[in-house]
Amino acid sequence: MALSRTHRVVAGVAHTRVYKKIWKYWYPLMTRGLGADELVFINWAYEEDPPMDLPLEATDEPDRCHINLYHRTATQADLSGKRVLEVSCGHGGGASYLTRTLGPASYTALDLNPAGIKFCQQRHHLPGLDFVQGDAEDLPFEDESFDVVLNVEASHCYPRFPVFLEEVKRVLRPGGYFAYADIRPCTEIAEWEAALAAAGLQQISHREINAEVLRGIDINTPKSRERVKRHLPIFLRAAGRNYIGATGTPPIPPDAKR
């Protein structure tokens, strides 16, 4: 997936120690400013060719392309009857969908954003689904607590990615699974892959999904632009379109991989 200029700056900041201070204020602001009640997914989009055509409830249909990425990532493992942890759950749309459709025994969704967690606790009420405020680099759970750990388009914001991977390994039970999707500029791919290789986790599958994400963004662009126009003041709209990933946000060079 390509990075816009705004995303380049954000990605650079994400690898510094000021990261938590920035995200500490940005995500609560987004929760309030972009209309959280309709924005239950904050991951970018995904669609295959031919389309995945997942059977969705009518209330899920507007978020189809967001759900596609969650579904494709999570179904790399069997969640049925499993203890699942999602790290960086955003506004909880993915947690809700996966809990309703894939039958985990329990689903714990964690995020650093306290406003987002409060929203999730008020919005998503399902048996076995729990939302917790916490840090991806210091997970507040006992060793070997989960069968599956899920992370969707979030770890590029972690300043200490190897520490996050250590935490994933710590909370996974023996034989557990880490299901993961994210983005890096091409200049950081080698470092990214080296960190994954050093984490002590066996890689079972891997694929690049640039085309699928761009296709999903194209489909979602009209809705994304309307959402930005409705909820953000004029001087923030360009940054908002860049952040949410709308077709035509300049520049989008082909120098990143997912």
From Swiss-Prot:
Do the record's keywords include Methyltransferase? yes
Fetch the InterPro entries from UniProt: Erg6_SMT_methyltransf, Methyltransf_11, PthPhpthDimycoMt, SAM-dependent_MTases_sf
Top-level enzyme category: transferase
Give the stretches traversing the membrane. none
The biological process GO terms on file are: methylation; sterol biosynthetic process
Instruction: Give its E.C. classification number.
Output: 2.1.1.-
Which UniProt keywords are given for this protein, alphabetically ordered? Lipid biosynthesis, Lipid metabolism, Methyltransferase, Transferase
Q: Which GO terms describe its molecular function?
A: sterol 24-C-methyltransferase activity
Q: What's this chain's function?
A: Catalyzes the methylation of the lipid moiety of the intermediate compounds phthiotriol and glycosylated phenolphthiotriol dimycoserosates to form phthiocerol dimycocerosates (DIM A) and glycosylated phenolphthiocerol dimycocerosates (PGL).
| NCBIfam families, per database record | PthPhpthDimycoMt
**PANTHER family attached here?**
HYPOTHETICAL LOC100005854 (PTHR44068:SF1), ZGC:194242 (PTHR44068)
Q: Which family does it belong to?
A: Belongs to the methyltransferase superfamily. Phthiotriol/phenolphthiotriol dimycocerosates methyltransferase family.
* Identification of the protein by name: Probable phthiotriol/phenolphthiotriol dimycocerosates methyltransferase 2
